[in-house]
Amino acid sequence: MQSSAIRKLIIALACTGACSAAQADVVIVVAANNPVGNMSKDQIAQIFTGKAVAFPDGRKAVPIEQGPTSPTRSEFHVKVTGKDAAQLKAYWSKVIFSGAGQPPKEVSGADEMRKAVSSDASAIGYLEKSQIDSSLKVILTP
């Protein structure tokens, strides 16, 4: 009986480790020429949920999302906005229905995200840490 419990514990721990390893390090980025420094998780969550439309210095902020099936998008929202995919969909449905706003523009993947953010000083997005190049500046690693 005890060996069965130990086996289950070992399997659970192995699965937890595998799941953690599968998650990449997501970072929040702006164009390298954007003057914004570090931002808090709450400030970024406000921008990505439409509750704020500007960077802390008052300049316009344009959030850009990866597509709804992106694992990076899921990780970003769980870590930053605290919403999973279903909660995010419900949130935006409510906001759209009430006329209070529209969800951020979506891009199809990391390459498009990198291009969109690096070419617009008002853009803010997220990528895996390994996908960052010199055209981008990391403002938060949640």
Question: Where are each of the predicted segments found?
Answer:
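Short, linear, compositionally biased motifs with a strong N-terminal bias
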Residues: 15-16
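Exported/periplasmic ABC-transporter solute-binding proteins
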Residues: 25-142
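Bacterial N-terminal signal peptides that target proteins for export
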Residues: 1-11
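Sec/Tat signal peptide C-region and signal peptidase I cleavage site
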Residues: 19-24
